[in-house]
Amino acid sequence: MSIIEDARHGIVTEEMKQVAKAEGVTEDFIRRSVAEGHIVIPVSPYRKVKICGIGEGLRTKVNASIGTSTDIVNIPEEIEKAKQAERAGADTLMELSTGGDFADIRRQIIANTTLSVGSVPLYQAFIEAVKKDGAVIHMKEDDLFRITAEQAKLGTNFMAIHTGINWETVKRLRNQGRHAGLVSRGGAFMTAWMLHNEKENPLYSEFDYLMEIMKEHEVTLSMGNGMRAGAIHDATDRAGIQELLINAELADKAHAKGIQVIVEGPGHVPIDEIATNVQLMKRVTNNKPFYMLGPIVTDIAPGYDDRVSAIGAAISSSLGADFICYVTPAEHLALPTPEEVYEGVISSRIAAHVGDMVKLKKVREADLEMGHARRDLDWERQFAVAMNPARARKIREERMPADTDGCTMCGDFCAIKIVNRYFKF
């Protein structure tokens, strides 16, 4: 039985127990939420991973995407990115290589992380078609499903599958137009394939077969967002909403079959439209775990998109998004370095925590502890509570004051020291 089927039969699995303990909730809450599809726990029969629950009532989780490109194929560096992401506190990884030996890269990444790993089988299928026949439009449907099964057998825990792109979605995209076109590689590949071959998306038309693969290998299905906006002026448009409606219907179908499902959301959304997107997605998907790709809230800050994304992610999380994909400072500019991966994860973890302070009041306890540590000028406690203790310690030690109780910001005029002479808080 799948983990959903166990939950439906009243069985609390070891994975459910681990999530309950980590999140400070009851085992029965986890079991019921998994059964209802409100929480997923990505697992695999092929490898043991650090168990992670994603969904309602749990801490917002952060994904870090890594992988080669056609210009840069450096497997040791990708392994280092995986390690940096895990050190920075990422909850999951997505391995999204588009250059090199896909199976070898994924195998090495999986061997060098304890985190759940996701993939996009569509990338490999289309890129192999380019290598073999010269263009993505020559991708064979059988190859797409074969690659999906092969990636599952490597121990992939969850997969982004672009099921929501069909003729209705493409028609709405064409009728409406866009300022920035399509920015999803999977969305662009599949749309081009459909238009050239005059055929329906096989991930949509053969969804029953896809579900067989997902079920057999216990892969969590992440409903891909191939029509997501690549500019804030394209946010919340008809093509994106059409894809969401299709994904929502297919997500219900997969859940009924005992397959865990996540639904992906948009990537570029102005702040005043975030609430609309989160509420709409949660409503039409029957409260399935919602995976927000950022979002980017302004398009004019390349080089700082980790911060731009953190603004959107904090708001999304506070409104109910369950899972956010990090963004690095290199977004829209280049393949990120390991250092940029680390920075991206930290930025997203801060955003997730800020959001969780709204929907999970208990996470504010860490902020309360930091407040007390600062009141007491207890630097070691401050470092221990900090999101990135090493960085906090480094900055202080590089600029250590003469009076080691305070810091070089205020020096002799430390407000806390002055008031502490008269008050005991």
Swiss-Prot record:
Pathway assigned to this chain's UniProt record: Cofactor biosynthesis; thiamine diphosphate biosynthesis
UniProt catalytic activity: 5-amino-1-(5-phospho-beta-D-ribosyl)imidazole + S-adenosyl-L-methionine = 4-amino-2-methyl-5-(phosphooxymethyl)pyrimidine + CO + 5'-deoxyadenosine + formate + L-methionine + 3 H(+)
EC class of the enzyme, as a word: lyase
Residues at which [4Fe-4S] cluster binds: 407, 410, 414
Bilayer-spanning residue ranges: none
Domain of life, per lineage: Archaea
Binding site for substrate: 94, 123, 162, 184-186, 225-228, 264, 291
Cofactor(s) in the UniProt record: [4Fe-4S] cluster
Cofactor binding description: Binds 1 [4Fe-4S] cluster per subunit. The cluster is coordinated with 3 cysteines and an exchangeable S-adenosyl-L-methionine.
Gene3D superfamilies registered for this protein in UniProt: 6.10.250.620, Radical SAM ThiC family, central domain
EC number(s) given by UniProt: 4.1.99.17
GO biological process, one term: thiamine diphosphate biosynthetic process
HAMAP family in UniProt: ThiC
Similarity comment text for this entry: Belongs to the ThiC family.
Protein name: Phosphomethylpyrimidine synthase
Source species of the chain: Methanoregula boonei (strain DSM 21154 / JCM 14090 / 6A8)
Lineage, highest ranks first: Archaea, Methanobacteriati, Methanobacteriota, Stenosarchaea group, Methanomicrobia
